[in-house]
């Protein structure tokens, strides 16, 4: 029996490989892995979303590059992957939030909104003539005085996190989050942790390239952090990291000297 090469299964979105894989969905995930780093942190008094917009040309107008979007007063989304795909899903999320508000007279829950977006994503993995969305969204907001954070995968899978990251810097960021995150972390601490993670993922980070928003439990209102405040946070974080690196270097030198003795 002639073996069918793996490449034969990556042309149609609806065809599984013998290993049970949908190659087009995996390619969509790869688009996310190559995208800009986005971080979400759920804190006891609010939620933080932070993104490195990774602007490489001084000719680009920074305001034209959006990676964090307000969906409703109490909910926002950060994206990584194909920008055009993200825009379509953000528009749909805003529409769903407004339909729910007009129909029921109250805000849509964060989980319900995330599920609606994932339903759309999943449908685009099951029909011919379409392709998966090459983008992941971090959907975050306040539900009944509680910070909620969800990640939507190109396959349509939905996972709730305390803190997570998407994009090219995910491995570095997740290592730091798993080490530093606490259940009682405050919004101020979450902001500093998010900036620290972005700085570790990209040492050449610039304040004007960073987009950060918060939504507090107290008023459940979307708020963008000004670039001046981001600049101060980055300077504080870089100073702290430099001191830690210097201390580690001194410890290594002491250890080396003791071994030589």
From Swiss-Prot:
PROSITE patterns: PROTEASOME_ALPHA_1, PROTEASOME_ALPHA_2. Its main location: cytoplasm. Keywords: Cytoplasm, Proteasome. GO terms for cellular component: cytoplasm; proteasome core complex, alpha-subunit complex. One of its GO terms (molecular function) is endopeptidase activity. Residues 242-261 are annotated as: Disordered. It comes from the Archaea. GO terms for biological process: proteasomal protein catabolic process; proteasome-mediated ubiquitin-dependent protein catabolic process. InterPro entries: Ntn_hydrolases_N (IPR029055), Proteasome_alpha (IPR050115), Proteasome_alpha-type (IPR023332), Proteasome_asu_arc (IPR019982), Proteasome_asu_N (IPR000426), Proteasome_sua/b (IPR001353). The formation of the proteasomal ATPase PAN-20S proteasome complex, via the docking of the C-termini of PAN into the intersubunit pockets in the alpha-rings, triggers opening of the gate for substrate entry. Interconversion between the open-gate and close-gate conformations leads to a dynamic regulation of the 20S proteasome proteolysis activity. It is found in: Cytoplasm. The keyword Cytoplasm applies. CDD domains: proteasome_alpha_archeal (cd03756). The 20S proteasome core is composed of 14 alpha and 14 beta subunits that assemble into four stacked heptameric rings, resulting in a barrel-shaped structure. The two inner rings, each composed of seven catalytic beta subunits, are sandwiched by two outer rings, each composed of seven alpha subunits. The catalytic chamber with the active sites is on the inside of the barrel. Has a gated structure, the ends of the cylinder being occluded by the N-termini of the alpha-subunits. Is capped at one or both ends by the proteasome regulatory ATPase, PAN. Component of the proteasome core, a large protease complex with broad specificity involved in protein degradation. The M.jannaschii proteasome is able to cleave oligopeptides after Glu, Asp, Tyr, Phe, Trp, slightly after Arg, but not after Ala. Thus, displays caspase-like and chymotrypsin-like activities and low level of trypsin-like activity. Belongs to the peptidase T1A family. This is Proteasome subunit alpha. It comes from Methanocaldococcus jannaschii (strain ATCC 43067 / DSM 2661 / JAL-1 / JCM 10045 / NBRC 100440) (Methanococcus jannaschii). The gene is psmA.
């Amino acid at each position: 029996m002639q073996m069918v090469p793996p490449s034969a299964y990556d042309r149609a979105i609806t065809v599984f490989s013998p290993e049970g894989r949908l190659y087009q969905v995996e390619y969509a995930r790869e688009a996310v892995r190559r995208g800009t780093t986005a971080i979400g942190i759920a804190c006891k008094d609010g939620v933080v979303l932070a993104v490195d917009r990774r602007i490489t040309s001084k000719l680009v107008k920074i305001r034209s590059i959006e990676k964090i979007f307000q969906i409703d007063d109490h909910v926002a989304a950060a994206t990584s992957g194909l920008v055009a795909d993200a825009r379509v899903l953000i528009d749909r999320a805003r529409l769903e939030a407004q339909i729910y508000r007009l129909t029921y007279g109250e805000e849509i829950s964060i989980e319900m909104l995330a599920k609606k977006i994932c339903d759309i994503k999943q449908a685009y993995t099951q029909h011919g003539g379409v392709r998966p969305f090459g983008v992941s969204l971090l959907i975050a907001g306040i539900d009944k005085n509680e910070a909620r954070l969800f990640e939507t995968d190109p396959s349509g899978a939905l996972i709730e996190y305390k803190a997570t990251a998407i994009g090219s810097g995910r491995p570095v960021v997740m290592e730091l989050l798993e080490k530093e995150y606490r259940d009682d972390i405050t919004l101020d601490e979450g902001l500093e942790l998010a900036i620290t993670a972005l700085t570790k993922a990209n040492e050449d980070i610039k304040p004007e390239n960073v987009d950060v928003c918060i939504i507090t439990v107290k008023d459940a209102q979307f708020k963008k952090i000004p670039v001046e405040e981001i600049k101060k946070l980055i300077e504080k974080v870089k100073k702290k990291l430099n001191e830690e690196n210097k201390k580690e270097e001194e410890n290594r030198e002491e250890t080396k000297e003791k071994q030589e003795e």
